[in-house]
Amino acid sequence: MASKCPKCDKTVYFAEKVSSLGKDWHKFCLKCERCSKTLTPGGHAEHDGKPFCHKPCYATLFGPKGVNIGGAGSYIYEKPLAEGPQVTGPIEVPAARAEERKASGPPKGPSRASSVTTFTGEPNTCPRCSKKVYFAEKVTSLGKDWHRPCLRCERCGKTLTPGGHAEHDGQPYCHKPCYGILFGPKGVNTGAVGSYIYDRDPEGKVQP
């Protein structure tokens, strides 16, 4: 039974479909949610199950501020501060509050765990190793937080970059050869990543 395209909600037939984020799309419906640029299956970032181009849209909207995690979408541009009256010159601090600050000593810096809670809340669990993923070591892909070494191709174990890979049933795969061999539509060139698959002979050997 043909599935429905999540963008236009119309039926997607085999000859016109591309698969990404666990869904079947019309080729021209797989577009960036922000700038509407046409995307290729697996060759894009995602957030909350929706596709985004890596740059500038994903990086601008969702990349961690000031932290380069080495993956796609690892930068974000700071938004300007909300407009309001700017205060110039020294700010007067009441004497009582100044004395209170002296008594309590200098403010303590946040611990590693508390800083994680401040930015991300309770740490998520890595879908690969089932251990907690802290902010400084995480990469985000397929709507989940992973340890960087845990984001690997399900078939060959190659380490992947966030958004820079294909996916099937919520699992990451490298584009070539794994996704193409396992899931690419046979004999149909959709012009997208992972659009070819090689038939296997009865003995299990891959035929070009």
From Swiss-Prot:
Widespread tissue expression; highest levels in the heart. The modification Phosphoserine is found at residue 104. GO terms for cellular component: cell cortex. One of its GO terms (molecular function) is zinc ion binding. Gene3D superfamilies: Cysteine Rich Protein. One of its GO terms (biological process) is hemopoiesis. Residues 98-119 are annotated as: Disordered. SUPFAM superfamilies: Glucocorticoid receptor-like (DNA-binding domain). CDD domains: LIM1_TLP. Interacts with TGFB1I1. This is Cysteine-rich protein 2.
